[in-house]
Amino acid sequence: MSRSLLVENSRTINSNEEKGVNESQYILQKRNVPRTILGNVTNNANILQEISMNRKIGMKNFSKLNNFFPLKDDVSRADDFTSSFNDSRQGVKQEVLNNKENIPEYGYSEQEKQQCSNDDSFHTNSTALSCNRLIYSENKSISTQMEWQKKIMREDSKKKRPISTLVEQDDQKKFKLHELTTEEEVLEEYEWDDLDEEDCDDPLMVSEEVNDIFDYLHHLEIITLPNKANLYKHKNIKQNRDILVNWIIKIHNKFGLLPETLYLAINIMDRFLCEEVVQLNRLQLVGTSCLFIASKYEEIYSPSIKHFAYETDGACSVEDIKEGERFILEKLDFQISFANPMNFLRRISKADDYDIQSRTLAKFLMEISIVDFKFIGILPSLCASAAMFLSRKMLGKGTWDGNLIHYSGGYTKAKLYPVCQLLMDYLVGSTIHDEFLKKYQSRRFLKASIISIEWALKVRKNGYDIMTLHE
């Protein structure tokens, strides 16, 4: 009798908790909770709870997971995945240009204002030590240990954050990350204004912590950068990745997900492929699982796993996506935090007076960095800065002044030049990313793909130098 009462009470509690969660999510949706500079923090608690649950469950059938992504190729089954993406490389951009309408007049939008909220992740609570219980490490006294910790903190504070850039090697399109100089040494020649001072009274803009936040993001982007050399373990990885990314963009656009979700999904996918050799006919499962993980991390309301399975046309079942999610998270050690390029673009847009024209064009150019295989291994902050630089050139704006250099993280024109050349090569070249180009030819995105392609073709035809254009 008592056991039945306990079961009934537990069911009642669970139903009340689910009801409370649904009501709280509905309230958040009705209030239009602003996204913070580090992403949507309202969903982090659920994500951490699910991750901890996955850790507790563990890999009960490890031998099965080892065979989940077999190493041998199965060409016959892979044809079912690649047959629907055999579009011509030459006809995609011409179709986009032929279907264009009258390009609308650009204007400014106050709704594009950056909104931030305070993030407590950089503040930690100090642990109080009892006077009667002293913690020793190898018979060291508390005073000696505290002095040693303070010394380490002073040494860390003296370190300057390196600024990474790209250096072109020979005639090949190979790039290598280098530490050129420190931020203070780069910016000492330029004058810039403290644009965060005007936001000191706005708690949503976190002007006091914004520098610490972006210092952390610059550190995080180096840690989560995929190793391009490891991707060559896969056969025909460039072509297969192009097909997979094109399909992911299609599903992302169909579900109406956030841009941050797409960037995170591609980053998780690239990092996983660097660690694991995947069978060709399992690539679609990898892409689906990565998009499913990213949507649960970034979105307030994530699409159901049944919807993801339905979009694969029977290639992946619900159980396959669940197994893929667990396997990918375990392989990445549940490290899915990512320095999203949208965060850096919002920061640079502050120095650009939040202009919607250049910002929309920069979104299109910045998304090229995840669809083109050449951009793997380039820092997201550098891609965001190059996209903003090139978008301003398209609109005939002024020079890359001190404010833009400072709020981009110290990227000068010389550092942006190699990445801008890669963006130009993509715009004037052929591609199979038809879903990506069609997405940005709509009025919602101010026909950014049409404007960018026409401008790039004109610049290359006349032999203009993009670095000195409109200066």
Swiss-Prot record:
Highest rank taxon of the organism: Eukaryota
Gene Ontology CC: one annotated term: cyclin-dependent protein kinase holoenzyme complex
Gene3D superfamilies, A to Z: Cyclin-like
Disulfide bonds: none
Pfam families the UniProt entry points to: Cyclin_C (PF02984), Cyclin_N (PF00134)
Keywords linked to the UniProt accession: Cell cycle, Cell division, Cyclin, Mitosis
One record GO biological process: G2/MI transition of meiotic cell cycle
GO molecular function: cyclin-dependent protein serine/threonine kinase regulator activity
SUPFAM superfamilies: Cyclin-like (SSF47954)
Keyword set includes Acetylation: no
Family: Belongs to the cyclin family. Cyclin AB subfamily.
Note from the entry: Present with 300 molecules/cell in log phase SD medium.
Its biological purpose: Essential for the control of the cell cycle at the G2/M (mitosis) transition. Interacts with the CDC2 protein kinase to form MPF. G2/M cyclins accumulate steadily during G2 and are abruptly destroyed at mitosis.
Name assigned to this protein: G2/mitotic-specific cyclin-1
